[in-house]
Amino acid sequence: NGAPQPFVRF
């Protein structure tokens, strides 16, 4: 998986 994943910080 070379595509960056949307990461959400809380």
From Swiss-Prot:
One Gene Ontology term from the biological process aspect of the record: neuropeptide signaling pathway
Phenylalanine amide found at: 10
Keywords: Amidation, Neuropeptide, Secreted
Keyword Secreted recorded: yes
Chief location bin: secreted
GO CC, one annotated term: extracellular region
UniProt keyword Secreted present: yes
Subcellular localization, as worded in the UniProt entry: Secreted
Summary of the function given for this chain in its UniProt record: Myoactive.
Family, per entry: Belongs to the FARP (FMRFamide related peptide) family.
Protein name: FMRFamide-like neuropeptide PF6
Protein species of origin: Panagrellus redivivus
Upper lineage: Eukaryota, Metazoa, Ecdysozoa, Nematoda, Chromadorea
